[in-house]
């Protein structure tokens, strides 16, 4: 594989394309696009905003073509292609120096686009291929912004609750606010705001479409490290992220795809023994813990969602619909 090169030294302003994958997000998409039109674009060229709609049924893309002064392109799929595949689809028709993969349940602020672009443009930052910013919620409080690469030990700590009881010994996958107070190099940027050099994105072949949703950015970030590029988190630049914009509508499906993508990640990147251990823990200890939590909450809907999510996973495993290795 030819190593991607940074953009430094090329003439003219850096250019940016924004890719948004939408699935039944209601008015969130409109708010997201509206915020882009208000963001600072001096110092770079915002070439295109591409919205890939994965067969939404709520009319969330209706009447948005002329919402912004920036050119907006809509790609409408007749079936839900999955998040990773739709991201690749949106990026395929663009040519800018940088790609920003942005969730429709986000809203950017004045410098949300410019600051990470400026960081990646600096010559001394050529080793960084991915950049992200601080995420905030409705109240303005910190929301998950970056993470460490998940190991079998990290997953075990999460499944058993040990990462909450003994966070010093059992670190969590998602980094805590106390770890994100200052700008720093991190393993992984959260995919809701994922700025990447086009050269790196193309060299890695984009996101792995076998991750229908979840873990696609974890996999990409790990492959970027293997190619010699790092991820950087900017603590002083923010973006609003609601979280769960579309997945809140189908919680059983969300659980299934989260577990499925996790297992696929394990079998793709771990040793076979560690991947097998991850699958065994997921299908025993974690399943029991989730069922007990649902029963303890006295929530029938939560119990049903858990049973449905795991049932779908068992069907997927039994029918060998997971292709573990490339």
Regions found by a protein language model. Name each.
Residues 109-145:
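Conserved donor NDP-sugar-binding/catalytic core segment of glycosyltransferases
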Residues 253-261, 272-326:
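Non-catalytic, C-terminal membrane-associated alpha-helical segments of glycosyltransferases
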Residues 35, 53-62, 79:
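A conserved acidic beta->alpha catalytic loop
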Residues 150-186:
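Short, flexible, basic/aromatic active-site loop/helix in glycosyltransferases
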Residues 181, 187-238:
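A short, conserved alpha-helix in the catalytic core of glycosyltransferases
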Residues 76-94:
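Glycine-rich, basic loop-to-helix element that forms the pyrophosphate-binding segment
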Residues 1-38:
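N-proximal low-complexity "stem/linker" segments adjacent to membrane-targeting elements
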Residues 99:
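Short aromatic/hydrophobic "clamp" motif used to bind/position activated sugar donors
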